[in-house]
A protein has these predicted regions:
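Extended, well-ordered protein cores
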Residues: 1-197
């Protein structure tokens, strides 16, 4: 696929494969068949007149947006052992797209990103590669405790978030457009109380 249609098409097809949509396999197949039959090469994704290519484009765009939002909105918390822990609950299976981003930016940290909906843990050990663990031996049932330092920082951050807001300029509609409700469940500044996992 990479040789025939280019890196952009390959990446888009990978995003579609991570989609939660039921017709993703059909869209991928129709896109590849269309590209091969019409010999479109690197211009495959530009042919949006084809229903398969268009469906692939729409799904890849939706997955790409969710990846982008999670890169912005993911919040790590320090656990008692010094490990950074983050929970996400994405619609699509995007954890493999997020890990290279965070592994590149946090190479000296031990961290875990937990996809709660799929029960997938992405683990990164400092100065090493990252890997995925699917439904490990009860990892989802272990009680994680947030460090005391993290509790203090979480409280300070939440207080900062709520006190910096200007009451007269509140715009909940705009806030919903910029930060949909489904991302807030896992964000420190929107939690009522700091909790242990």
């Amino acid at each position: 696929v990479m040789k025939t249609f280019g890196m952009e098409a390959y990446f888009s097809l990978c995003e579609v494969a991570a989609s939660h949509e039921e017709d993703k396999a059909e869209a991928i197949l129709r896109t590849i068949v269309h590209g091969l039959s019409d010999k479109l090469g690197f211009t495959l994704l530009n042919d949006l007149r084809d229903p398969g290519v268009y469906r692939t484009f729409v799904m890849a765009r939706n997955v790409g947006k969710e990846i982008h939002f999670h890169k912005e909105f993911l919040r790590f918390e320090e656990l008692e052992g010094g490990i950074l822990y983050a929970q996400i609950g994405p619609k699509n299976n995007i954890i493999t797209f997020l890990m290279p981003h965070f592994a590149d930016r946090l190479p000296l940290e031990n961290f875990v990103i937990h996809d709660v909906k799929r029960n997938i843990f992405a683990l990164h050990e400092a100065k090493k590669d990252w890997y995925l663990v699917y439904n490990p031996m009860g990892l989802d049932r272990i009680k994680y405790t947030v460090s005391d330092k993290e509790k203090q920082y979480s409280e300070l951050f939440a207080a900062f978030f709520h006190t910096i807001a200007i009451k007269e300029r509140e715009n909940p509609t705009l806030q919903l457009n910029m930060l949909p409700l489904r991302y807030r469940e896992y964000m420190t500044e929107f939690r009522q109380n700091v909790k242990t996992f």
